[in-house]
Regions:
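Long, hydrophobic, amphipathic alpha-helical segments used as structural scaffolds
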Residues: 1, 20-28, 70-74, 94
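Short, charged amphipathic alpha-helical segments flanked by flexible coils
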Residues: 21-51
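Short amphipathic alpha-helical leader/targeting segments
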Residues: 14, 26, 77-80
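Short, hydrophobic, well-ordered secondary-structure elements
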Residues: 1-21
Length: 94
């Protein structure tokens, strides 16, 4: 159930980044913003630094692997990285 775990992490990350943008009064222009859209907004408004921005990009890539790429199977290590990264985002980005 690696793909399902990755998809859930993606939803959690996206919701958290959306809430962070709301707290900082940052509005997304897209109707349905993605993790990457929120990540760009947070970077542009100096809420996250470059290292954090890159880490979020990596986690978004792992989430996309789980949701979209049927020819590439996520590994246990990929999902463990995604779960740990999700936990870190929730604890460190406000």
């Amino acid at each position: 159930f690696y793909r399902a775990a990755g998809a859930i992490c993606g939803v959690v990350i996206e919701k958290h980044l959306s809430e962070v943008c709301t707290q900082h009064q940052i509005k997304a222009t897209k109707k349905n913003p993605t993790i990457n859209d929120y990540n760009e907004l947070l970077k542009a408004n100096n809420i996250v630094d470059i290292a954090t921005w890159r880490n979020i990009q990596r986690l978004a890539d792992l989430r996309n692997m789980c949701d979209h790429h049927k020819d590439i199977e996520p590994t246990k290590d990929n999902i463990e990285e995604l779960i740990a990264g999700t936990d870190k985002i929730l604890k460190t980005i406000f």
